[in-house]
Curated annotation (Swiss-Prot):
EC assignment: 6.3.5.-
Top-rank lineage group of the source organism: Archaea
Name of the molecule in the record: Glutamyl-tRNA(Gln) amidotransferase subunit E
Physiological role: Allows the formation of correctly charged Gln-tRNA(Gln) through the transamidation of misacylated Glu-tRNA(Gln) in organisms which lack glutaminyl-tRNA synthetase. The reaction takes place in the presence of glutamine and ATP through an activated gamma-phospho-Glu-tRNA(Gln). The GatDE system is specific for glutamate and does not act on aspartate.
Pfam families: GAD, GatB_N, GatB_Yqey
Amino acid sequence: MDYRSLGLKVGLEIHIQLNTKRKLFCHCPPVLRDDEPHFRIERRLHLSVSELGAVDPAVLWEVRKRRRYIYEGYRDTTCLVELDEEPPHLPDEEALATAVAVAKMFNAKIFDEIHVMRKIVIDGSNVSGFQRTMLIAYGGKKKILGYDIGVETIALEEDAARKIAEEGKTVVYRLDRLGIPLIEIATEPMSYPPQQVEEVAWIIGYSVKITGRAKRGLGTVRQDVNVSIAGGAKTEIKGVPDLSLIPKVIEYEVQRQLSLLKISEELRRRGVGKLELSTVDVTQVFTNTKSKIVKRVLETGGKVVAVKTPGFQKIFGVEVQPGRRFGTELADYVRAWTELGGLLHSDELPGYGITAEEVRDIISKLGVESFILLMGVDDRELEEAATVVVDRLNTALQGVPEETRGANPDGTTRFLRPRPGAARMYPETDIPPIRITFEILKKSEEIAKVSLEGKLSELTSLGLSKDLALQLIKSPYLEKFEDYVSKYKVPPQQIATILLNISRALAREGVEITDEKIASVLEALEKKIITKEAVEEVLRNMKAGESAEEVAKRLGLVRMSYEEVKKVVGEVVREVGKDRALGEVMRRYRGRIDVEDVRRALSELYF
């Protein structure tokens, strides 16, 4: 796919939890807990207009869901700030200094005075109904590993509560995560292809991680990806769980927008105009139905309603992403706006136990061949779902709607809510403006001393190639590598190869590789008991509690002394000549003999 000609623009929002001693706006410890909560409270959130009288569309959408929220907490690690019963404390200075340090790393312009803002969040994940956030810096630019990275903004904010369960209109959150400091780095739109966007995301994440101030573990880093193409619309994709999924998410979103543009073009070609809401109760058609889906609804006193969609024949079945069709998009909207489980559309019928005869009867009642079937027991839900479907189909005439979508594990996405507007942000009235003091700047300078470029330089100075150094930085073995280099007099390149290549290859074979085994091998290399060529076989055959030296003796892989090497080199030269001796010696004695010893012996004996 030629992304440049498609006008691809991608923006990243990288969210990273900071490893501080306290939460951002209170003094509770930032720890997640799995033990039984000490208390639960119930809240319902209500909409209020901003100071300018504006209402945010995303907030309005959430309010219409009429949900009930349960919050779980602990007496020793949850306080009244998290329960929105006490004003917030002043922000944690350690978190502020870290955010300023990251801003310096990307040459961003740091504000002299920080103002805390309230960002309306009414999905229940913030007890107060808003998230506290503060803009730290803007307009950063830096070239790293050949990538020109433009940073639009760097913000410091509180993380949301942790969702524990959801059933119907009730959502359960735990307050342990609420308030943990979170740094958000938002990039300028970039035109790099998907694989390179993944690399940029890694660079940004590692730049924070290398400070030692980032939390580690599952869920501590989250990526949002904004994608648009020429003629399409900006789509925000929330919660991409893993960096490796970013290229797929971008690729599939481009595919989706292209498909929606083709659908729009086809509808215009057909002369399809704005749809008016028109529904017909077709429950009687299914009096003797064999469809399990329909029977299940009818047995609970429900009904089947058909929505007329003239001109949409063969449109609902158009694939917009792998395994997802335009009809799936409509079903996502229905599930998001109502409690209904989805819908059926005319392009997939007959099917699901619905017969061709039943389809003909529906068409006869409607007077059109294209329709959507909705099933449920609540008339208001059915009416709302029908309205949602017609609104989305009318949007399809224009092309691609601006949406916030959620990432699925396979890289496809689903509709979450409309894109938020500017009305969701307003000043926090309980916290005064914060000056960036000399003390904060001094702390930030200490934190910013380390960098990705500095770490690369440090590793290449040890004799590692730039590619190998990058592999090591991206791997989980960097700290172990540095530890082993400080403990064993073994060439750093050999240590890196053992960690990155040999250990991984053996692990794929099902061989258990432990720190103790690697340490034993490095000790044997240092003492010249084994050669680097023997490492893989020794590790493969090492049993628990066995040393590398014991394994080498058992396998006959103990390294030859230099005197032995000279002896075998002389014998082989007499057999095959000097020119072929090196290769022949290594072939015969591989694993027991070091190539540098062979070269030295040849040089001393014959040159």
